[in-house]
Amino acid sequence: MLETLLHYLSFPFVRYALIVGVLIALCSSLLGVVLVLKRLSYIGDSLSHIAFGAMAAATALNLSDNLLLVLPVTIVVSILILYSGGRTKIQGDAALAMLSVGSLAVGYMLFNLFPPKGGNVSGDVCTTLFGSTSILTLTKEEVWLSVILSAAVVILFVIFYHRIFSLTFDEDFARATGMRTGLYQLGMAAVVATVISLAMNLVGSLLISALLVFPALSSMRVFHSFKKVVICSAIFGVSAALLGLLVSILVGTPVGATIVAADMAGFFLFGLIGLFKKGRTA
Amino acid sequence: MALLTVQNLSAGYEGKPVASGISFSVSSGDYLTIVGENGSGKTTLMKTVLGLLPPVSGKVELGDGLRKNRIGYVPQQTAGQKGFPASVLEVVLSGCLGKSGLFYSKKEKDLATKQMRRMEILPLQNRAYRELSGGQQKRALLARALCAADSMLLLDEPAAGLDPVVTQEMYEVIQSLNREGVAIVMISHDIQAALIYSKTILHLAEKPLYYGDVFGYKREYFLEGEQHA
Ligand SMILES: Nc1ncnc2c1ncn2[C@@H]1O[C@H](COP(=O)(O)OP(=O)(O)O)[C@@H](O)[C@H]1O
Ligand SMILES: [Mg+2]
């Protein structure tokens, strides 16, 4: 088995997949902590559907790099959601549901009206929704772009770590101590959109939420300080992505679904550990 | 010189005032309690004073070198904080953010230690905030606020949800801070406690019903101990 693995690793596209997969999982699990604690995980879900629509449009337009369209569209929508969220509280979530399901439908329509050259529609839709093979077909440029963007996300997270904590724990207090929370929220919206656009390649649009939510929720069951939750979440996300990628390469299961399965297994494991810890202290 | 002066202020949301005609001032050593029924705009007023909401009209002035990020604020507990994974130390340290760079230096860590000792929660510093009792959580939030500023504290219903014994303790902690020179502005609907502990009262309705010292308030509203609700 090790030999098979080494054999696969000798292919550059497999190495690319592992590098990009791990980086995306790392970013998602860091941001996931903030989204889960701020009760904003539904925004991640909606944004991923928007990204699907944008991806369909990019395919229809025959762009050289789909990210050129997906990234800006997702960022703009993310910022719009942030701002409208502050104003129209009453039906904000329903409006968001409308927007996200609408862009799924339009996206599917576009795939059918403008089928990609030489591709088959259902295969492409499947890839975009569930990320079946896209991670294994990355070009060198896509790999570099992913590496640079992910590195930027991680560095920003570390630099502003304390401010992110304060903003997440108590927004009003953060503002009262002079923090320009609007600016940070703007940045956060842009970063979340970036990570979601990148994650389209790894697990596809429908499974992105898993990368955001599972690591954070699992870590919160076991750890009680913000720092430990963040660190554990990062390790959890990276491990699940690595495990999922390796299993899918060896066994031939779909990449995205295998990663999410690994996340789910980890969640149950951590749930048990959490119960055990509680039982001992109670 | 006053630490805080509020002049003919209307506080509200999106240009619609909830409470108006509010004027008061707070000087070093003062203890002001804002009382009033639920929904009378106490929290709205406090958020306006803090600069979290723009004033609908009127003025809020901070004096004596008090900067916007130097007011200690103890908000009401928000729903999101119930299960939040954070250690007491992490919560308290976040009070130093207005003064710190990107990361906390020894100076800020010492300040956090000092304020936790002051609130008698130093032994709890590595415990999970979400597993503390209500009273201990309030002490952690007080320590956090004191890290941000120790000349004036703004407290929004600090006794809400606490049992009577802990409520009593909380009032005494706040009083001892006041005796150490911290000006207190507190929202409460516990009028009895306000009469005992505070020096001035602001009774808020749509318009302020009363602003002045405690004795005058007693005379006006509690003639011979008989309560007009
Ligand atoms: N975010 C908001 N937007 C609009 N109106 C609000 C908002 N928050 C509170 N209010 C309204 O302002 C009034 C005063 O609320 P508040 O200041 O919280 O009262 P209190 O703290 O005295 O109980 C209430 O009628 C409430 O419905
Ligand atoms: Mg209130």
Predicted regions and their residues:
Chain B
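Catalytic Walker B motif of ABC-type/P-loop ATPase nucleotide-binding domains
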Residues: L153-D156
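Conserved ABC ATPase "signature" region
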Residues: K106-L124
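Conserved ABC ATPase signature
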Residues: A128-L132
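Helix N-cap at the start of a conserved alpha-helix in ABC-type nucleotide-binding domains
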Residues: P164-V166
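H-loop/switch region of ABC-family ATPase nucleotide-binding domains
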Residues: S188-H189
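H-loop (His-switch) and adjacent beta-strand-loop-beta switch element
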Residues: T200-V214
